[in-house]
């Protein structure tokens, strides 16, 4: 049995030297290196993520736009409502102002009329005051009594003997002194008493004459000397001539 021939292992240097000596008859172009699939997958995921974020951003943007439109619409509505309320308020206040102006003008005219009337009344009062000052004042009660005076029927006066008796009973005797006078002076009290007695006698005589019945008296037997006609002024039996004389 023959043994194989074992040759020594060639070194790498010799192998490289051999390769460098090889000459290629054609120029070959190596194709570009293709990207790795993982890198492509990452790029695709990144692109999808960007697209998703763009869509989300678009939705948020649209939502914000809708909110802005709604807010602007609500603001315009509130503004229009407020303007309408203000216009109505201005209109009502204008009516109130016109009413007050009309009332003010009317009151001013009334005030002028009252002032004119007051001035005229003051002048009239001054005139009447001057007239009343020139005329003597008269009591209104007395004036009323004079205007409404009604004469009364005459009543016969009866002589009262009791009064005369009382007067004679009150007379002081001549011997009694008043206590203020003496024998050497004139007593004033006695003189006054004498004058008073004379006046009482005159009144009694006049009353007696007035009570005397007329010749045509129907009741001469009456102790008073009067009849039913004596008390009637229209049918009196008293002689007026005796009273006058």
UniProtKB/Swiss-Prot annotation:
It is found in: Cytoplasm; Nucleus. This is AP-1-like transcription factor YAP5. Residues 34-47 have a biased composition (Basic residues). The keyword Transcription applies. Residues 68-77 have a biased composition (Basic and acidic residues). Residues 86-114 are annotated as: Leucine-zipper. GO terms for molecular function: DNA-binding transcription factor activity, RNA polymerase II-specific; transcription cis-regulatory region binding. Homodimer. Residues 63-82 are annotated as: Basic motif. GO terms for biological process: cellular response to iron ion; negative regulation of transcription by RNA polymerase II; positive regulation of transcription by RNA polymerase II. Residues 58-121 form the bZIP domain. One of 8 closely related fungi-specific YAP proteins (YAP1 to YAP8), which all seem to be transcription activators of the environmental stress response and metabolism control pathways and to have similar but not identical DNA binding specificities. Transcription activator involved in the regulation of genes expressed in response to environmental changes and metabolic requirements. According to genome-wide promoter binding and gene expression studies it is a coregulator for the expression of ribosomal genes, while its own expression is induced by the cell cycle specific activator SBF (SWI4-SWI6). One of its GO terms (cellular component) is chromatin. Residues 34-77 are annotated as: Disordered. Disulfide bonds: none annotated. Keywords: Activator, Cytoplasm, DNA-binding, Nucleus, Transcription, Transcription regulation. Coiled coil: none annotated. Its main location: cytoplasm.
